[in-house]
Regions:
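Aromatic- and glycine-enriched glycan-recognition loops and surfaces
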Residues: 1-15
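Conserved nucleotide-sugar donor-binding subdomain of glycosyltransferases
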Residues: 93
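The substrate-binding groove and active-site-proximal loops of carbohydrate-active enzymes
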Residues: 1, 24, 75-90, 107-116
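Short, flexible turn/loop "capping" segments at secondary-structure junctions
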Residues: 72-74, 102-103
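Short beta-strand segments at enzyme active-site cores
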Residues: 13-17, 110-111
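Active-site-proximal helices and loops of the catalytic beta/alpha 8
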Residues: 3, 7, 21, 29-30, ...
Length: 172
């Protein structure tokens, strides 16, 4: 009803989606679909927190350790980090986003914590989304304030070549 009534008044609805993490009370934590559904599944014995430093994405000389800690670490103990490198997790997230577009008729997606999810998975998701819905509105939250860092995440950016995020719009 919310979307139908909003559309009747000329209001568009943008849904906030989060592919990076979920809450610790989610059913997936209590009954994991597979052992690598999350990054750092042994978090109770060996918790790894993200470094919150996005520079390993843009630094070609960043160590694998720094990149892994930033990308695979959890925000906090209450926010399990989803493993988008797992093909089942990835496919679920893609299908779930398509379901919301088709079922609920949402007008756009704001992707929360875009850089903290797996880069290749997010790039592929955007590619699939753009192929299925070429004019769809999607914006990625990057959590960076410098224009050059923000531009790195933009689709077809020369700064991130040969990689391509396929993300049409970014915000800090």
């Amino acid at each position: 009803q919310l979307i139908e009534k909003s559309h009747a008044r000329g209001i568009k609805i943008v849904m906030d989606m989060i592919f990076n993490h979920c809450g610790v009370e989610h059913v997936w934590i209590k009954d994991m679909p597979c052992k690598d559904w999350f990054n750092n599944p042994d978090h109770e014995k060996n918790f790894v927190q993200t470094s919150f430093k996005l520079t390993p994405h843009v630094d070609p000389y960043a160590s694998k350790y720094d990149f892994s800690q930033m990308n695979d670490g959890w925000f906090v103990t209450a926010m399990p980090d989803l493993n988008q490198k797992n093909p089942h997790v990835y496919r679920y997230l893609v299908q779930n986003s398509f379901w919301w577009i088709e079922y609920a008729n949402i007008d756009g997606i704001r992707m929360d914590t875009y850089p903290y999810a797996d880069y290749d998975a997010m790039s592929n998701w955007m590619k699939e989304l753009n192929e299925e819905y070429p004019n769809y509105n999607t914006v990625g939250e990057t959590w960076v304030t410098e224009p050059a860092y923000t531009a790195w995440w933009q689709k077809d950016s020369k700064l991130s070549a040969p990689k391509n995020s396929n993300l049409k719009t970014v915000m800090d």
